[in-house]
Design a protein with these regions (language model features):
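A short, conserved, highly charged catalytic patch centered on acidic carboxylates
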Residues: 1-135, 149-214
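A structural signal for short, well-ordered beta-strand segments and their strand-loop junctions
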Residues: 136-140
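Loop/turn residues immediately N-terminal
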Residues: 142-145
Length: 214
């Protein structure tokens, strides 16, 4: 893992030389390496296009930036997803550009509790990631959060059914509103701050990261 000094230097160079989201990917990947046990793998899927090879990574709403997988997972073309294969997805990382304002916990809770008719954009991506991957690191390089969906067999079955319905509907050339099919379902999650400012709280931040269980 990068030292605090190395991380600060890289953040400064990003600001100075190439202020784009993708610059954070290797830094974030380095920070989360200690969370990967011998049985886990991290893969970059942000550049994938929606296809049968990528359906399981797209899930409900989008491709996250990094996914955490069981090492025994093997990707292949799929027109439907079996729950046994889905469970080999252990989590994901959603990275936003440096210092981008992250969606607050209050806004996420309000969206879910009010069952808004439609959700799009970053909110739709984040809630879709949470439901599909169950565990999400959400960061802008300074602020770091860890969202975790409570295990519940009923919602698991619903989510996989909705994704398979999305695949079928889109293959027929039609659009699909996944949120409309899930918004009335009951689910709980936690939203934990790993750090509001990882540079100012480095030691505590590193400690919390190392405690993450995928």
């Amino acid at each position: 893992m990068l030292s605090k000094e190395e991380y600060i230097e890289e953040i400064g160079l990003i600001e100075k030389q190439n202020y784009v989201e993708v610059e954070l990917y290797p830094l974030v990947a380095d920070i989360i390496n200690p969370t990967l046990k011998n049985s886990l793998s991290k893969r970059y899927v942000f550049g994938r296009r929606k296809s049968n090879m990528g359906q399981i990574y797209y899930g409900l709403s989008n491709f996250p930036d990094i996914v955490i997988l069981d090492k025994n997972y093997q990707n292949k073309a799929r027109k439907s997803i079996e729950i046994e294969e889905w469970k080999k997805l252990r989590g994901c990382v959603e990275i936003k550009s440096l210092k981008h304002d992250l969606i607050t916990e209050e806004k996420i809770k309000s969206t879910i509790s009010n069952s808004f008719e439609h959700i799009t954009g970053e909110m739709g991506q984040l809630i879709g990631d949470l439901l599909w991957y169950k565990k999400v690191i959400y960061t802008n390089g300074i602020e770091w959060r860890f969202l975790s969906l409570d295990d519940k067999e009923e919602i698991d079955n619903t989510i996989v059914q909705v994704v398979n319905k999305r695949i079928e509907t889109e293959e027929a050339g039609n659009s699909f509103d996944w949120w409309k099919n899930i918004k009335d379902s009951s689910f709980n999650y936690t939203d934990i701050y790993l750090s509001k400012d990882c540079i100012q709280e480095w030691d505590e931040f590193v400690k919390k990261v190392k405690e993450i269980e995928w």
